[in-house]
């Protein structure tokens, strides 16, 4: 039996909104597997939906850089330990230099990018007194690229055809706010669809309806699900009366791809004493 820790119960509560005892029971039944616990809670009606894993706990900045022709761009995440350093001029200048190099040399391998700037990073760490990490980099190509940055913590890059700069900017702002995972409903992977379909079918069957009626109920729920996780299926944040897909159709435009980075996605900042860490490293040297 896996150990059911308080932090595991806390995470399940945060992701489902369910009570502490319900979460602890679900984790015990799932032998500590939080994803299985969430599935079981959804099937039983204890959790209607679940937030994605990965609390944003790291500090840092997201930078986007686009080539002069507007057809190629990169997006980079740089992490530090505190918000104070994230606003430091030296840290921001270093991050900008890294992003500029990634664009100029088309460096999208994170290890290559880290190696290129390791000496400068080490010097900056010694100067600032905090750990700094070049966390990830990605690229995007297209007929026209647009970007949006929200307070340096969220960065979006969009590739589109048939769109002007204003439209693509609005689409990027929508992506920053609504967090779509795919461009179109049909882009949702088959395994993701199958997983959600099974959950919705189990929920529908518990209502006592015959299977064929339950299947019909699930069809509607699945259309809603794929719409909610895809850009074109979402209601446009600036005009909820239409979907992003309808907006694009009005302008005879298409989105061919997008990237959305948010500082600290998928990681939780480990509370460590950096001075003690450096001291420990010195002893081991």
From Swiss-Prot:
<dbReference type="InterPro" id="IPR014039">
    <property type="entry name" value="Transl_elong_EFTs/EF1B_dimer"/>
</dbReference>
<keyword id="KW-0251">Elongation factor</keyword>
<dbReference type="InterPro" id="IPR018101">
    <property type="entry name" value="Transl_elong_Ts_CS"/>
</dbReference>
<dbReference type="InterPro" id="IPR036402">
    <property type="entry name" value="EF-Ts_dimer_sf"/>
</dbReference>
<dbReference type="GO" id="GO:0003746">
    <property type="term" value="F:translation elongation factor activity"/>
</dbReference>
<dbReference type="InterPro" id="IPR009060">
    <property type="entry name" value="UBA-like_sf"/>
</dbReference>
<protein>
    <recommendedName>
        <fullName>Elongation factor Ts</fullName>
    </recommendedName>
</protein>
<keyword id="KW-0648">Protein biosynthesis</keyword>
<comment type="similarity">
    <text>Belongs to the EF-Ts family.</text>
</comment>
<feature type="region of interest" description="Involved in Mg(2+) ion dislocation from EF-Tu">
    <location>
        <begin position="82"/>
        <end position="85"/>
    </location>
</feature>
<dbReference type="InterPro" id="IPR001816">
    <property type="entry name" value="Transl_elong_EFTs/EF1B"/>
</dbReference>
<dbReference type="GO" id="GO:0005737">
    <property type="term" value="C:cytoplasm"/>
</dbReference>
<dbReference type="Pfam" id="PF00889">
    <property type="entry name" value="EF_TS"/>
</dbReference>
<keyword id="KW-0963">Cytoplasm</keyword>
<comment type="function">
    <text>Associates with the EF-Tu.GDP complex and induces the exchange of GDP to GTP. It remains bound to the aminoacyl-tRNA.EF-Tu.GTP complex up to the GTP hydrolysis stage on the ribosome.</text>
</comment>
